[in-house]
Design a protein with these regions (language model features):
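Extended, regular secondary-structure scaffolds
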Residues: 92-94, 99-214
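Short, Lys/Arg-enriched N-terminal segments with co-localized hydrophobic residues
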Residues: 1-3
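Short loop/beta submotifs within extracellular cysteine-rich repeat domains
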Residues: 34-35, 71-74, 83-87, 118-119, ...
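Short, structured motif recognition centered on aromatic/hydrophobic residues
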Residues: 23-27, 59-66, 74-76, 107-115, ...
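N-terminal trafficking/processing presequences and adjacent post-cleavage segments
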Residues: 5-26, 89-113
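N-terminal-proximal low-complexity accessory segments that begin disordered
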Residues: 5-70
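Amphipathic N-proximal alpha-helical interface segments
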Residues: 63-92, 159, 175-181
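Short, ordered beta-strand-loop transition motifs
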Residues: 53-59, 82, 145-152
Length: 214
């Protein structure tokens, strides 16, 4: 391993913005399928201590973990000093990359637009969707029967705000879970265990939400 990147003065320096951009560009150049991939982890592969002790002029190797347009998880190593893709492997279905913000917000949008979800809210007397907060959680453990093996999934729970500025976590919409298949980009089931009254108390602690302050 030779040749230090021009963006770094020491082999253990964190990646610069330009190095991260270079790594992504190299990945997309060598594999066109990554044109629309999302990345959950990009970091420097630190060199072996022995090698570092013997030579401070080392190549910079970047590890990227992400999800491609087919929702397959992958790991790749890129030599940004030589602008080469060293390795790329698909991640086993038994594991998966961290959820990306795009997936999380995508799950929220899919849930909010789902007709059965909206009907479940109406059954609870909830009609103003702007006051509903949806929180997607990992879909592992007991995987919904309608989600194919290997597909990426989230399960979403909901909370109801009494105003736009309210702390929604004080008012859970209980007994309602949306199972979202991220790979198929659809809600596969709305799990409804019956109506439970939403707590009425507010949880706002700003001056407008409290009559008196301690």
């Amino acid at each position: 391993l030779l040749h230090m990147s021009e963006n770094s003065s020491h082999p253990l320096n964190i990646l610069s913005a330009s190095e991260i951009s270079d790594a992504v560009s190299v990945l997309k150049k060598f594999n066109k399928d990554h044109e629309n991939s999302s990345f959950s982890y990009i970091s420097l592969n630190e060199p072996d201590k022995k090698l570092l002790k013997e030579n401070s002029d080392l190549e910079r190797i970047v590890k990227i973990v992400g999800v491609d347009k087919k929702s397959n998880g992958f790991e790749a190593e890129i030599n940004i000093s030589k602008k080469e893709l060293l390795t790329e492997e698909k991640i086993s279905n038994k594991a998966g990359p961290t959820y990306t913000l795009a997936e999380i917000f995508g799950a929220i949008e899919l849930t909010m637009k789902d007709e059965n979800y909206q009907k479940a809210l109406e059954k609870r007397g909830i009609k103003d969707l702007s006051l509903v907060q949806i929180d997607p959680w990992p879909g592992g453990g007991f995987v919904n029967k309608n989600i194919k093996n290997g597909n990426r999934a989230l399960r979403a729970i909901s909370f109801l705000k009494d105003s736009v500025k309210d702390n929604a976590y004080a008012r859970p919409i209980q007994g309602l879970i949306a199972h979202v298949d991220l790979t198929e980009k659809k809600v596969v089931e709305i799990e409804d265990h019956g109506v439970v009254k939403v707590p009425e108390a507010t949880a706002r602690y700003d001056k407008d939400g409290q009559e008196t302050l301690r």
